Amino acid sequence: MARAKFERSKPHVNIGTIGHVDHGKTTLTAAITMALAALGGATGKKYDEIDSAPEEKARGITINTAHVEYETPNRHYAHVDCPGHADYVKNMITGAAQMDGAILVVSGADGPMPQTKEHILLAKQVGVPNMVVFLNKEDQVDDAELLELVELEVRETLDKYEFPGDEIPIVSGSALLALEALVENPKIQRGDNKWVDKIFDLMDKVDEYIPTPDRETDKPFLLAVEDVLSITGRGTVATGRVERGTLKVGENVELIGLKDTKATVVTGLEMFKKTLDETMAGDNVGVLLRGIQKKDVERGMVLAKPGSITPHTKFEAQVYVLTKEEGGRHSPFLVGYQPQFFIRTTDVTGKIVSFTHIQMKNPSSVAEEHSNKMAMPGDRIEVTVQLIYPVAVEKGMRFAIREGGRTVGAGVVTNILEE
């Protein structure tokens, strides 16, 4: 079937919902699509349509991530509903990289919870630049002063993780009451229902506060592969988000990382099930590759302009070691520690060859002679990492360190080391 063409008439922004489990992220996502559908800017999705999101296999863990699209009068949005469960933080690390901004959902009845903090920290580490807060379940809070206290606590928490807590817009409301009103009457307009109006207010704030990102369209093309599909009779499609640059049908690209670098030609591009002649930074796109077998491509490789990036196994980085309260390790680790490094969309085993301290959580508790042999939870360290496979690594790139299904550190590459 011939695909409709994707129209690029408004600025495009990638956002997502983050926050603690059961604080209402999915309900809010549904309410936003239904409210904007009433204005003709979306296809309304009910809660169960988003909640039963297609399963994505990430390293043996099945993760559901819902992608929905909608428009406000000013912009086109692609919205990811990030799973809130602590085990799904992996996807936050690969998925939150897909966000130009986030809507942090906090239950007004409960206030910030451990995962709220973990998601704010991760948003900082994976480079989500801006967020707007939705204080949900307002209908369950009888006392306006309590809601103000929760708002204050949210602002303090944001400050702690170096977001501008005083400036960030906070909108309170009830996603559930808005959604129920919209399910009952899908044509609700502004001014008809106070709960639905709060959803419109939230989207106004998202429009105003989350800047249209400066797309990195002038840099050389790069896409981190998230998934690979085989289309009978057409070939192999690599999907992912264009990190930078632009790409036209017919151009040459290289597949880099994990295996030997391969050169290929782009024979087609698709976005939201529509064909494109050209894709640019920020798009979630499928790239059809000539002469490439499905087995040649895997999650974690990058597609890039030939010669623009090379694979490496050794680099220096600055790393923050999470405390146990943040879900990290309970005990220190030593030189020679071998965790998993999550780089763009890949996890690769690597070894910490050496480290020096930048900032110690409890300087007095560790004897001097141990200080550069032992990294304690809460420390900030400069490390040298040796990966077992080469991947496309570059200066300024962020990554997470994982062990046994949990995030134990977050870092940024400061220097590439030649072998």
Curated annotation (Swiss-Prot):
Annotated stretches, region: G2:
60-64
Residues reported in the UniProt entry to bind Mg(2+): T26
Organism superkingdom: Eukaryota
The UniProt entry's GO CC annotations, sorted and at most eight, read: chloroplast; mitochondrion
Q: Where is this region: G1?
A: 19-26
The yes or no answer to whether the keyword Plastid is present is yes
Family matches, as Gene3D superfamilies = P-loop containing nucleotide triphosphate hydrolases (3.40.50.300), Translation factors (2.40.30.10)
Provide the GO MF annotations for this entry: GTP binding; GTPase activity; translation elongation factor activity
G3: annotated segments: 81-84
Region (G4) location: 136-139
Q: What is its EC number?
A: 3.6.5.3
**What is the reaction catalyzed?**
GTP + H2O = GDP + phosphate + H(+)
Which PROSITE patterns did the record assign?
Answer: G_TR_1, G_TR_2
Q: What is this protein called?
A: Elongation factor Tu, chloroplastic
According to its UniProt entry, this protein's organism is Tetradesmus obliquus
Q: What is the lineage of its organism?
A: Eukaryota, Viridiplantae, Chlorophyta, core chlorophytes, Chlorophyceae
